Amino acid sequence: MIPPGARAVIWLLCTYPETREADERVQAAARLQRTLGLPIWLFGSRSAQYPTPVEQTLRNKLVAAGVPADAVACSIELTTAVTLDTSQEAVNVAATARARGIDALVCVSNRLHLLQARALLRRSGLRLILAPTPLRDRRWWYVTVRLVLIPLAMLGLGHRFPPLVLLRRARARLASWPV
């Protein structure tokens, strides 16, 4: 799993914290933290959909699942970079890992999300250990978007995909979702 002598962290990827799938990811990350003794990093997306930051909601769930609070680090504690989507999250996680001497990431999410993250980080030099959880979000648009973003990420275009850039800019300006 993790190479001997490697410095590793658990990276919990999650954008929608109030779902059954998110709860399963939190439980998986908590089990891994107890088993491996590694810290958990949260680089949750900023979303106007939730009144509190996504990563803070996830931290609260992890602590409720028995993870020590000091074993969970939110992106605001690790970097000043903004994270609005998986592409930015991957860039920020890789930069933070390099700056902190981390060699390996144990990545927790559903398989589609993990494939995208792996594609985005394929040239980062980081060892990725994938810890997939079940895909519960089977909305047609979610699956379709992930299936489009995976090959774009493999081509190195994920962060420059025009619809994603426009969405990212719109999300950055919203204090709350339009009613």
Model-derived features with residue positions:
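Active-site cores that bind ATP or allylic diphosphates and position pyrophosphate for catalysis
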Residues: R168-V179
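A transmembrane-helix-recognition feature enriched in membrane-embedded lipid enzymes
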Residues: W140-A170
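A structural signal for short, hydrophobic/glycine-enriched beta-strand patches
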Residues: M1-V145
